[in-house]
Curated annotation (Swiss-Prot):
The lineage of its organism: Eukaryota, Metazoa, Ecdysozoa, Nematoda, Chromadorea. GO terms for biological process: cytoplasmic translation. This is Large ribosomal subunit protein eL22. Keywords: Ribonucleoprotein, Ribosomal protein. The keyword Glycoprotein does not apply. Belongs to the eukaryotic ribosomal protein eL22 family. It comes from Caenorhabditis elegans. One of its GO terms (cellular component) is ribonucleoprotein complex.
């Protein structure tokens, strides 16, 4: 006969660890220049973020989108991908025709920054000059 597991150990196996994740999207330069509106980005993220395959259920799943002066923060207590946040930010830029001038760059472990593309002044920097 196989012994049954104790009730306490079964409960421990079912209990899940709470995950506290916070990801930021820093948009300082584009917001100061008036190219990007931070409120529009927040509304877009609130509308488009999917949790468990459904949009519009952020509050029920403990996911919050917060706005500071030039920063959007996504705070989640359920598993949430930083890469998904980058995907949605790029989608927002494309939808507003800003993707040609702005890019999304990872600054550190939990922060993205929206930056301008750096375009070199010299077209052929490596060619021979006559």
């Amino acid at each position: 006969m196989v012994p049954k597991p104790h009730a306490k150990s079964a409960k421990k196996a079912l209990r899940k660890k709470k995950v506290h994740l916070k990801f930021n999207v820093e948009c300082k330069n584009p917001v100061e220049d008036g190219i990007l509106r931070i409120e529009d980005l927040e509304a877009f993220l609130n509308e488009k973020i999917k949790v468990n395959g459904k949009t519009g259920h952020l509050a029920a799943n403990n996911v919050k989108v917060e706005v500071a002066k030039s920063k959007v923060s996504v705070v989640s207590e359920v598993p949430f991908s930083k890469r998904y946040l980058k995907y949605l930010t790029k989608k927002y830029l494309k939808r507003n025709s800003l993707r040609d001038w702005l890019r999304v760059v990872a600054v550190n472990k939990n922060t993205y920054e929206v930056r301008y593309f750096h375009i070199n002044d010299g077209e052929d920097a490596g060619s021979d000059h006559e």
